[in-house]
Structure formats: structure tokens, C-alpha cells
A protein has these predicted regions:
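Structured alpha/beta or helical-core interaction and ligand-binding surfaces enriched in interleaved
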Residues: 1-116, 120-175
Length: 175
């Protein structure tokens, strides 16, 4: 056995994944758009982490495709939203089927039901934040190929109950 020094550590996740986590970043009509694709856990975690870059009061919309219910709230405290997302992270990553948007007049973060992250903004600051999280800008990303309609999401009563409880905790109103 030869010892050549310290080998760089590579996690199994990094070694055997199909493609690097990536995003597209475009600029049209005064708005920047980022579309982020990675594994489900990473996308949900990015939504939670990047939401910390929003101002202290944000607007929130939640749409549960399984139950068909939607909620909306204006000027909701960011720490409360982040706490609710933290509680939902595992269920969202596991089941999907919930669209969650946190936005202001300047920025919008949207986690879609297929567990992809979209960012809409008036400035390009999100490009640098995404690169800082280790994501690679790509010409195009492979969208989730398993997109289905509402009837094809697997039953997830735990997620439906957790989303309903989160909407109540945040004081969101039915949309």
C-alpha cells in the first residue's frame, strides 16, 4: 500500500450521482430567473436556507395538490415561515405535491410540487448565492421527468396534516 498523503474526501452522494447539482439563470424583461434542480432533500434545504435572504416580512402562498387546498398570507414574519418550512422539510422532500412560495416585491422563491426550486428577482444577487452553495450554472437543467397531475401523487396524510397545521400556525387564510 502506498501512502501519498491525504486523499480528498468524496461522499458517496457526490461520487455516484448522475449529474452535478445545477441551475439555469436567465434575464428577461427586467427579471432574473433561476431554475434549480438537485436531489429532493437538497432542493428543499436550499429553499429553507435561501429564504433567510428575504426581508423580515414576506408574503406566502401554499398550495397542497393532494387536498386541493390553498392558503395565502401577507406580511408574515420570516422566522415563523422558516420554522414551518424546517418542520416540513423531510415530508416535502419525501412526498412532494406542495407548492410553496415566499415572496416580496423584489424576490420570489418557489418550491414547486415536483421539488424544483424557482427564483424570480429584480437583481442578479441570487446567481452568486447559488454559486456560493456549490451549484453549477448550466445552459439547461433536466427537469423532473416524473411530473404527474394531482391524482398521481402518492397518498401522504402526514404531509397533508402537517401543511394544514403549518398554514394555521402562520395565520394563513384560504385562497
Amino acid at each position: 500500500m502506498f501512502f501519498r498523503g491525504r486523499q480528498p474526501e468524496a461522499s458517496i452522494w457526490r461520487r455516484f450521482r448522475v449529474s452535478p447539482d445545477g441551475f439555469t439563470f436567465t434575464h428577461d424583461d427586467g427579471y432574473y430567473t433561476a431554475h434549480v434542480v438537485a436531489n429532493a432533500e437538497r432542493v428543499v434545504d436550499l429553499f429553507h436556507t435561501l429564504s433567510d435572504e428575504l426581508p423580515p416580512a414576506i408574503d406566502v402562498v401554499m398550495d397542497d395538490l393532494r387536498s386541493g387546498r390553498s392558503w395565502k398570507g401577507e406580511s408574515v414574519a420570516l422566522p415563523d415561515v422558516r420554522e414551518s418550512v424546517a418542520r416540513l422539510k423531510n415530508l416535502l422532500a419525501r412526498y412532494g405535491g406542495v407548492e410553496l412560495s415566499a415572496y416580496t416585491s423584489e424576490d420570489q422563491l418557489t418550491l414547486n410540487p415536483y421539488i424544483e426550486l424557482f427564483i424570480y428577482a429584480r437583481t442578479d444577487r441570487w446567481l452568486y448565492l447559488l454559486e456560493g452553495k456549490g451549484l453549477e450554472e448550466q445552459a439547461r437543467v433536466r427537469s423532473k421527468s416524473w411530473k404527474t397531475n394531482r391524482q398521481h401523487f402518492p397518498a401522504a396524510p402526514d404531509l397533508v396534516n402537517a401543511v394544514t397545521a403549518a398554514a394555521e400556525r402562520l395565520g394563513l387564510q384560504p385562497a
